[in-house]
Amino acid sequence: MKQRILALFLALCLCLPLAACGKKQGYDPLEGVQTRVVTDSAGRQVEIPADIRRVAPSGSTAQMILMPIAYDLLAGLSSSPSTAQMPYFPEEVRDLPTFGQFYGSKANLNMESLIDARPQIIIDLGDKKDSIADDMDRIQKQTGIPTVFIEADLDDMAAAYRMLGDILNRAGMAEPLAQFIEKSVTMAQENSAKLPESQRLSVLFGTGSTGLACNAAGSVQADVIDLVGAVNAIIPEEVSNRGGGSTVSLEEVYAVQPDVILLSTGGPYDTLAQ
């Protein structure tokens, strides 16, 4: 009898943590709420809450695009703001939990932290990768949270804000941004079309701690170079849309002789500016 009681006690002890884990993983943002179906940029039909109050960005790009119209809806951040970014982050979001990002050279998604933040929807914004539909399906299956992809290259940015406005019921905030983007892009296209080839400057867009991680021709991060009528000095054999860009050597920089070198602060620019 004592052995049976002990066995039953041990079984209960083993079941308790499993039940707790199942409850945590079983968070269902669609339970007991009105829902609707949207079609995302990957062609996936996704059931989402009709009234969304908590959003998780998939990474730094999604976080940046969401911030102007939905900072107060963020359930967490893909990454904490840097010292340089801090002044541009509303105080309400600076101390939100971080759960990492899906893609890029800094991919570090913490699935448990993401679920703990209890978002009602996960939104991925950026370039349309070949695997995007499968990626979104996988994340949605693993988390149990509706996951949508919105294409947000430079050409699609206005449409991306309109789709965000629809999903988050914030069309009134999204539409002015969409119109501003359309106006700015059109102005840049018209001005660059007037530039003769002889006046188009070659540009090296360097990032990272050394400035040698370049946003090369064909990458979504470098679209703005083409938009303004410049020529990307770095033309790689294989285009990288990862956050780290395409790494080049100093010898390659010397070889292409760019007219202009663009560097971000916090890296070699600070050293050169001294």
Question: Over which residues does each language-model region extend?
Answer:
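Sec-dependent N-terminal signal peptides of Gram-positive bacterial secreted proteins and lipoproteins
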Residues: K2-K24
